[in-house]
């Protein structure tokens, strides 16, 4: 897969998630954090010129934060937003995780 394709695919899936989330947006602290997380990731993707480990780490940070807000936080997604999240989740595990390089000691639990 070409590098620009990864950036464009990420931008597309996150934009779809943002659009679906905005339709059923109910103000809460977790919802505002999620919206801020989406905006920050899209800003980073607009600046990205190529896929490198820095970008992949940013995408992983986005994924981890969003997962925490959706799974353990008080963020309730509407059905469309949840389906968009599942699509991004699947794409993230298929594309980002295999390319991500982790440096330093890691512990297998």
How does the language model describe each region?
Residues 1-39, 105-106:
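Short terminal alpha-helical segments
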Residues 38-44, 90-93:
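Eukaryote-specific, cytoplasm-facing alpha-helical/coiled-coil scaffolding segments in long proteins
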Residues 20-32, 47-53, 74-78:
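Charged, low-complexity interaction regions
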Residues 29-39, 56-60, 82-86:
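Short, charged, amphipathic alpha-helical segments
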Residues 63-109:
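Amphipathic alpha-helical binding modules
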Residues 7, 17, 28, 45, ...:
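Short, intrinsically disordered, low-complexity terminal segments
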Residues 15-18, 22, 43-46, 64-67, ...:
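Alpha-helical repeat scaffolds in large eukaryotic proteins
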Residues 44-60, 103:
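Short, positively charged, low-complexity/disordered linker segments
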